[in-house]
């Protein structure tokens, strides 16, 4: 609980964005200096830790509060990330979704709305720290609604359950892990809101890794082992996304971290 707001507990996102369509004014991945395989996970974990500190600063400054629009919060987060963390680019758009917009996924573009006093709000950020992508999703309850509090409390618990299942068998397919995540959400009393349950993350930009992009997502369309190497022959590093939605579709919450 911070400033009277309950937020998703940390364990130290639904992206339907077509990453293949993204463009950046940066060198292609093939032009970047290669990174040693044994350091890549360490660097991604360091980027995630920095992103979590960015969330700490967002909460410190009270950016998520009633009376401001989602777009205003997105803009202020961008300013904060640049000012205090030196973030010059984000590999995906900054996402703030509140109230009925909290059931939407990253690829949606719902109308901007003003955050209200009893809202649930989720934030999904993809800052790039030096060469490394982070991807963090976190949810907040602004009021006292017990169902919203229960959903936000369930997010990291369901995440941990799905993560533990994967770690028992890293060779499972993306489709199998998606199905498990969907079933875990249902067992907790929620709908699984995402078309995917995660995706690759890497040196910026993972969208430039060669190969079929469907195989780089945790989704029903990925029948291949998640332990397979990527299109450059390297280990794949995954983000796990948990998007829980109320059975009546009135609100949802989002949580993501490295798998």
Predicted segment positions?
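Active-site neighborhoods and metal-handling regions in enzymes and metal-associated proteins
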Residues: 23-259
């Amino acid at each position: 609980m911070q400033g009277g707001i309950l937020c998703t507990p940390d364990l130290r996102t639904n992206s339907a964005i077509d990453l293949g369509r993204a463009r950046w004014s940066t060198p292609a991945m093939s032009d970047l200096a290669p990174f040693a395989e044994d350091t890549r996970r360490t660097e991604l974990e360091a980027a995630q830790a920095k992103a979590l500190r960015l969330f700490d600063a967002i909460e410190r400054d009270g950016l998520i509060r009633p009376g401001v629009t989602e777009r205003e919060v997105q803009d202020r987060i961008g300013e904060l990330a640049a000012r205090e963390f030196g973030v010059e680019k984000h590999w995906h758009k900054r996402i703030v979704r509140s109230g009925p917009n909290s059931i939407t996924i990253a690829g949606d573009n719902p109308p901007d709305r003003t955050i209200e006093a009893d809202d649930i709000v989720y934030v999904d950020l993809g800052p790039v720290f030096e060469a490394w992508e982070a991807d963090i999703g976190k949810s907040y309850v602004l009021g006292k609604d017990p169902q919203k509090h229960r959903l936000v409390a369930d997010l990291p618990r369901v995440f941990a359950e799905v993560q533990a299942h994967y770690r028992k068998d890293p060779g499972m397919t993306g489709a199998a892990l998606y199905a498990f995540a969907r079933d875990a959400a249902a067992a907790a009393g929620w709908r699984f809101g995402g078309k995917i349950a995660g995706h690759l993350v890497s040196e910026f930009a993972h969208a430039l890794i060669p190969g079929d992009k469907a195989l780089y997502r945790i989704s029903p369309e990925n029948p291949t082992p998640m332990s397979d190497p990527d299109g450059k022959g390297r280990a794949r590093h995954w983000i796990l996304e948990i998007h829980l939605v109320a059975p009546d579709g009135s609100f949802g919450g989002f949580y993501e971290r490295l798998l």
